[in-house]
Amino acid sequence: MHALIIINRAGSLIFQREFGSSPTALTPNEYLVLAGTIHGVHAISTQISPLPGSSGIQLLEAGTFNMHILQTHTGMKFVLFTEKKTTNARLQLQKFYELYSDYVLKNPFYTLEMPIKCQLFDEQLKRYIDSH
């Protein structure tokens, strides 16, 4: 895994975490632009799909990495950047959504749609990443 970003239903970046060290790490501003771009392209892809009820882009394959997208029923997008050989990204995205539900949404001090600043979420995310 390279990075995880969470985009709220309005298209704003509310969480970003890189895993390991990467010489091509993005700046915070670049992550904001990336989140807005992903949100827009995802929305357009649902409209231009020839099949009604399309859920939009779920996987984008690039030359050196893959971008996996999980859109929740509430419109949140969990975006995971992985190596090409990663096979269980969908399960990982489900787990990240589960951690988000357990440690962010159940936090009485968290305001929906706002940037995620939750220590328990960070700790559980790190624990999961370290174990995989």
UniProtKB/Swiss-Prot annotation:
The keyword DNA-binding does not apply. It is found in: Golgi apparatus, cis-Golgi network; Endoplasmic reticulum; Cytoplasm; Nucleus. One of its GO terms (cellular component) is cytosol. Its main location: Golgi. Coiled coil: none annotated. SMART domains: Sybindin. It comes from the Eukaryota. One of its GO terms (biological process) is intra-Golgi vesicle-mediated transport. Keywords: Cytoplasm, Endoplasmic reticulum, ER-Golgi transport, Golgi apparatus, Nucleus, Transport. Part of the multisubunit TRAPP (transport protein particle) complex composed of bet3, bet5, trs20, trs23, trs31, trs33, trs65, trs85, trs120 and trs130. Belongs to the TRAPP small subunits family. TRAPPC4 subfamily. PANTHER family: TRAFFICKING PROTEIN PARTICLE COMPLEX SUBUNIT, TRAFFICKING PROTEIN PARTICLE COMPLEX SUBUNIT 4. TRAPP plays a key role in the late stages of endoplasmic reticulum to Golgi traffic. This is Transport protein particle subunit trs23. It comes from Schizosaccharomyces pombe (strain 972 / ATCC 24843) (Fission yeast). The lineage of its organism: Eukaryota, Fungi, Dikarya, Ascomycota, Taphrinomycotina. The gene is trs23.
